[in-house]
Amino acid sequence: MPLFAKAEFMFRLNFKTGIVTTSKNSAENYYMIGLADDKYDYKNYLLFQRPIKLGRYEDADAPHNGLYAECNGDICYNGCKAVKITSELIVFEVQDSVIDMDIHGVKIPKRFIQYCKEIFGDLLSIEG
């Protein structure tokens, strides 16, 4: 079953994060954060993107102008319900799934929290 598919039960994915990346691509107009279990030989990964700024004539309610999520090849738009970051863990609630990512000991880019705030807005809570 795809991770972002609707289901009557909650799907849970847990993995140890090996790398965290961030980017702000002004030319392509997006903020992005990415987390994976390995830099090159990854089995599990998660990406989130949001436009930096919408153009004057772009529809803010169009799905492709919202929050893009991709996990292990499955994609959804605007399905993220909540994100919680602690010193040891990041928990994403996406549609009917929960993704727990152990970040203990992982180098976190200095812009990670800033970009998370831009991407997730009010969905984000930070503890510690």
Predicted regions and their residues:
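Ser/Thr- (and often Asn-) enriched beta-sheet segments in non-cytosolic proteins
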Residues: 12-14, 19, 84, 89-93, ...
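Charge-rich, low-complexity N-terminal segments
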Residues: 1-41
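Generic detection of short hydrophobic beta-strand segments and adjacent strand-loop junctions
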Residues: 8-13, 48-52, 99-102
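An extracellular/secretory-lumen and virion-surface interaction module
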Residues: 2-5, 19-25, 55-63, 90-94
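Short, internal acidic amphipathic alpha-helical interface segments
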Residues: 52-89
